[in-house]
Swiss-Prot record:
Membrane topology classification: Multi-pass membrane protein
Organism: Homo sapiens (Human)
Ranges in the topological domain labelled Extracellular: 23-130, 189-210, 262-283, 353-357
Disulfide bonds: 41-64, 55-96, 78-112
TM segment ranges: 131-151, 168-188, 211-231, 241-261, 284-304, 332-352, 358-378
UniProt similarity note: Belongs to the G-protein coupled receptor 2 family.
Protein name from the UniProt record: Growth hormone-releasing hormone receptor
Signal peptide, first to last residue: 1-22
Function: Receptor for GRF, coupled to G proteins which activate adenylyl cyclase. Stimulates somatotroph cell growth, growth hormone gene transcription and growth hormone secretion.
Top-level taxonomic group: Eukaryota
Gene Ontology terms for molecular function: G protein-coupled peptide receptor activity; G protein-coupled receptor activity; growth factor binding; growth hormone-releasing hormone receptor activity; peptide hormone binding
Biological process, per Gene Ontology: adenylate cyclase-activating G protein-coupled receptor signaling pathway; cAMP/PKA signal transduction; cell maturation; cell surface receptor signaling pathway; cellular response to glucose stimulus; cellular response to insulin stimulus; determination of adult lifespan; establishment of localization in cell
Glycan-bearing residues: 50
GO cellular component terms given for this protein: cell surface; cytoplasm; membrane; nuclear inner membrane; nuclear matrix; nuclear outer membrane; plasma membrane; sarcolemma
Length: 423
């Protein structure tokens, strides 16, 4: 196999990895290193005095061969990136003949072997992960859309807490849609060079992906903040708090994503904006996410503390305790699901722990929207009751509007009445 084809084959085998990891392209590090080596080699060759004797310095696509005299053998080690596949360091020789450089001996595939069977298994693994997260996001979109329809269509379910849930559902739909858009824009062809590919659509898809991810984290945090406010206050202003959450939950992601896009356009408009591993501007996106994860985890611990105190028998009647529990149980199932997960990985480098991170964040994580829809809608007793009433002809929408508002959405002064079974 020709040395150029051998190098290209290795990179093609690695190409499924960026499809799964999104913004991490390890093969681009290899290509970038080769391009730098080629540039240095050609520059050194130009600086060497011209001579008709021997063989000039040359770049063969993988290694830079220095100037050599006629009849001289030159031995060079395999390119550095081959060390990722084998601990044994190979070497390649070339003879400077009267007609020029000879072919490398032994050939690159022999001197610099790559375990293609292992790479084929990894390719199959990454393809399987992609299938799993595609199925997971698809199921989540359907479930979330149904959940939003239910919460919007049934007026007796209208209350600030369910409004917050609806916003969270929407962010999961956006996040899943952004994944599909990014896959379509960046990985529509196996021949795409991810290291130099640059179109308006691919940049928009990457920016949309970052925005959707930030909104998802911000509304996960909003869920924790809102529940903290309800549990900690005896007379919470639910609707006013909701509109503050709307402003922060959507406004901050717009601000940070817009700032990141501006920095990319002005200072780092290269490739498809997804080579963020060493970019300082990546922290405009990652920094707020890491901070929100830490705050969310702290709020989770505070919620547990409040619930333990409020659920003590001495604190109130069994009826009040039941109301607190019914209010918080779905959120308590959700916050640990995300908090523990992200508290482990978000403070680590992006390429750390990929063996565990891939199946959790991409595989299991793609079903998170589906899980949220189940916890906050389909298993919610009040939602099931309202659906049952409409199904059996007892339409709650036929009740007078003033009765519906007074019973279901208007908070009273009493903490026990504020934390109703519905909101």
């Amino acid at each position: 196999m020709d040395r150029r084809m051998w190098g290209a084959h290795v990179f093609c085998v690695l190409s499924p990895l960026p499809t799964v990891l999104g913004h991490m392209h390890p093969e681009c590090d290899f290509i970038t290193q080769l391009r730098e080596d080629e540039s240095a080699c050609l520059q050194a060759a130009e600086e060497m005095p011209n001579t008709t004797l021997g063989c000039p310095a040359t770049w063969d696509g993988l290694l830079c061969w220095p100037t050599a005299g006629s009849g001289e053998w030159v031995t060079l080690p395999c390119p550095d990136f081959f060390s990722h596949f084998s601990s044994e360091s190979g070497a390649v020789k070339r003879d400077c003949t009267i007609t020029g450089w000879s072919e490398p001996f032994p050939p690159y595939p022999v001197a610099c072997p790559v375990p293609l069977e292992l790479l084929a298994e990894e390719e199959s693994y990454f393809s399987t992960v992609k299938i799993i997260y595609t199925v997971g996001h698809s199921i989540s979109i359907v479930a979330l859309f149904v959940a939003i329809t239910i919460l919007v269509a049934l007026r007796r379910l209208h209350c600030p807490r369910n409004y917050v849930h609806t916003q969270l559902f929407t962010t999961f739909i956006l996040k899943a849609g952004a994944v599909f858009l990014k896959d379509a824009a960046l990985f529509h062809s196996d021949d795409t060079d991810h290291c130099s590919f640059s179109t308006v659509l691919c940049k928009v898809s990457v920016a949309a992906s970052h925005f959707a991810t930030m909104t998802n984290f911000s509304w996960l945090l909003a869920e924790a903040v809102y529940l903290n406010c309800l549990l900690a206050s005896t007379s919470p202003s639910s609707r006013r708090a909701f509109w503050w959450l709307v402003l922060a939950g959507w406004g901050l992601p717009v601000l940070f994503t817009g700032t990141w896009v501006s920095c990319k356009l002005a200072f780092e408009d290269i490739a498809c904006w997804d080579l963020d591993d060493t970019s300082p501007y990546w922290w405009i996106i990652k920094g707020p996410i890491v901070l929100s994860v830490g705050v969310n985890f702290g709020l989770f611990l505070n919620i547990i503390r409040i619930l333990v105190r409020k659920l003590e028998p001495a604190q109130g009647s069994l009826h009040t305790q039941s109301q607190y529990w019914r209010l918080s149980k779905s959120t308590l199932f959700l916050i640990p699901l995300f908090g523990i997960h992200y508290i482990i990985f978000n403070f680590l480098p992006d390429n750390a722990g990929l063996g565990i991170r891939l199946p959790l964040e991409l595989g299991l994580g793609s079903f998170q929207g589906f899980i949220v829809a189940i916890l906050y809608c389909f298993l919610n007793q009040e939602v099931r009751t309202e659906i049952s009433r409409k199904w059996h002809g007892h339409d709650p929408e036929l009740l007078p509007a003033w009765r519906t508002r007074a019973k279901w959405t208007t908070p009273s002064r009493s903490a026990a009445k504020v934390l109703t079974s519905m909101c």
